[in-house]
Curated annotation (Swiss-Prot):
Lineage: Eukaryota, Viridiplantae, Streptophyta, Embryophyta, Tracheophyta
Name of the protein: Aluminum-activated malate transporter 7
Segments of skewed composition (Basic and acidic residues): 467-485
Entry's Gene Ontology cellular component terms: membrane
Region (Disordered): 461-485
Chief location of this protein within or outside the cell: membrane
Role played: Malate transporter.
Gene that this polypeptide is encoded by: ALMT7
């Protein structure tokens, strides 16, 4: 009984992980039920006979999870069957001309030669990537038709029936796959790359995102205000970490480890890109979409993830510099990490919306500017009294962070190439981290941490509203008080000038 419960739990977990798997299972059952009518419906059985089993076999081996995989396998199988069928008929005709004695010998030679050559060609990397299944079916079909033809007088009729049933089975798979709850490999690849961007940005930015939105004097301040708790490189390496309890430490460690899934995503990306090439245009993805460029972006993201993995090990190294040095280096390091994370986050959002990542350029430039500030600080001789072992650990970590910034710039360039090739639309300016407002409903937010857990938010709008009081530089000051109770976050906002409004967010 316990085994049954375990199987049920596993089934629920698999279905919850991706509900499309349940739909795919029903689709396979539907196609098999349709092609089985070759046996149940007498006129169809009279036409094809036992060769109807080839339609069933085609459905079983061709129907895959995504449209691209199904199309690829289906077209490969049909093409291989047609080609092998034609060659099989030709081989049988040539062998029959040699008489009863020489016919089996020649057929054996033909089967040996084509099987040996086809198997060798399967080792070619490009062929193996896209046409391995086609060659496998070619070997099987040629051998079966050649051998069957030796005992079957009407070899052409036999070949026609088998090819027809294979085509019918393949078409059934393709039609159901495309028109009944389709799963597009291209969309999955697109989402995977965007998700990888987010995982890297999560490490660099931190693991706490608080969304605050309010209405101050009937002015929509923001769609989303992101107040980052900077658990990034600067905070983690250059500040004294307080004891938050074992549960909090474990949770944060688990959140930061999300980037590790990017390290092993290469095979998944390549298979999705290969399947996506077979798919017709769908949604925002036109035919011959530049899927190869997605692989280039994914490769650079993976290189960045390896740098982050190495950096993470140095963050937890035993040899740490003194608190004074940490405080002096904290600000530029924090800016380098934060701006890189912002650029990654903006690129993720741009890719999801298929817009050009124009706002990421500013964050990359800010990160490079912080890198120059750090270089000037190091040239000032701040590390003269640091112990050699501590110095090695510190400089290695800094070098890795600089590499991350350089890779972020390369990723951005590669994403620009993808945006141009895929004809992404121009972005409507509403970046999450904009420094200057572009419209009435969008404002820039600068937070200044005060005593305890109070934060003063300086909010700047376009200056077209006279109902709200401003300070001398045209900005509004809002005092934010934040409390944490259990798992909820309560935020109270009050305008310093007029005390107009408050908001609570969970």
């Amino acid at each position: 009984m316990e085994k049954v419960r375990e199987i049920v739990r596993e089934g629920r977990r698999v279905a919850k992980e991706d509900p499309r798997r349940v739909v795919h299972s029903f689709k396979v059952g539907l196609v098999l039920a349709l092609v089985s009518s070759f046996y149940y419906y007498q006129p169809l059985y009279d036409s094809f006979g036992v060769n109807a089993m080839w339609a069933v076999m085609t459905v079983v081996v061709v129907f895959e999870f995504s449209v691209g995989a199904t199309l690829g396998k289906g077209l490969n199988r049909v093409a291989a069957t047609l080609f092998a069928g034609g060659l099989g008929i030709g081989a049988h005709h040539l062998a029959s001309m040699s008489g009863p004695t020489g016919e089996p010998i020649l057929l054996a030679v033909f089967v040996f030669v084509q099987a040996a050559l086809s198997t060798f060609v399967r080792f070619f990397p490009r062929v193996k990537a896209r046409y391995d299944y086609s060659l496998l079916i070619f070997i099987l079909t040629f051998a079966l038709i050649s051998v069957s033809g030796f005992r079957e007088e009407q070899v052409v009729k036999l070949t026609h029936k088998r090819i027809s049933t294979v085509i019918i089975g393949g078409l059934s798979c393709v039609i159901i796959s495309i028109f009944v709850c389709p799963v597009w490999a291209g969309q999955d690849l697109h989402s995977l790359i965007a998700s990888n961007f987010e995982k890297l940005s999560f490490f660099l930015l931190g693991n706490s995102f608080h969304y605050v939105s309010s209405d101050l004097n009937s002015i929509t301040l923001l769609r989303k205000i992101k107040s980052w708790r900077l658990a990034d490189f600067g905070d983690k390496y250059c500040e004294v970490v307080e004891n938050d309890g074992a549960k909090e430490v474990d949770k944060r460690k688990k959140d930061f480890d999300n980037y590790k899934s990017v390290l092993n995503s290469k095979s998944n990306e390549e298979s999705l890109a290969n399947f996506a090439k077979w798919e017709p245009g769908h949604g925002q993805f036109r035919f011959r979409h530049p899927w190869k460029q997605y692989l280039a972006v994914g490769e650079l993201i993976r290189q960045c993830a390896y740098r982050i993995h190495a950096l993470n090990s140095y963050l937890n190294a035993d040899n740490q510099v003194s608190v004074d040095i940490k405080k002096k280096l904290g600000e530029p390091l924090r800016r380098m990490s934060l701006e890189s994370g912002k650029a990654m986050k903006e690129m993720s959002i741009s890719l999801k919306k298929m817009t050009k990542p124009s706002s990421s350029d500013l964050h990359v430039q800010n990160a490079k500017s912080a890198c120059k500030s750090l270089t000037n600080l190091l040239n000032s001789g701040i590390l003269k009294e640091v112990e050699p072992l501590e110095l090695v650990s510190l400089l290695t970590a800094i070098s890795l962070l600089i590499d991350i910034i350089n890779l972020t710039e390369k990723i951005l360039e590669s994403l620009h190439e993808l945006a141009t090739a895929a004809k992404f639309k121009n972005k409507i300016e509403h970046p999450l981290f904009s420094e200057k407002p572009k419209a009435k409903s969008f404002v820039s937010v600068r937070s200044i941490k005060c005593h305890d857990d109070h934060v003063v938010i300086i909010i700047e709008d376009d200056g077209n509203n006279d109902d709200t009081s401003k300070n001398d530089n045209g900005s509004k000051e809002v005092s934010i008080h934040e409390k944490h109770e259990d798992d909820d976050t309560h935020v109270d906002a009050r305008c310093v000038s007029c005390g107009h409004t408050s908001v609570c967010v969970k």
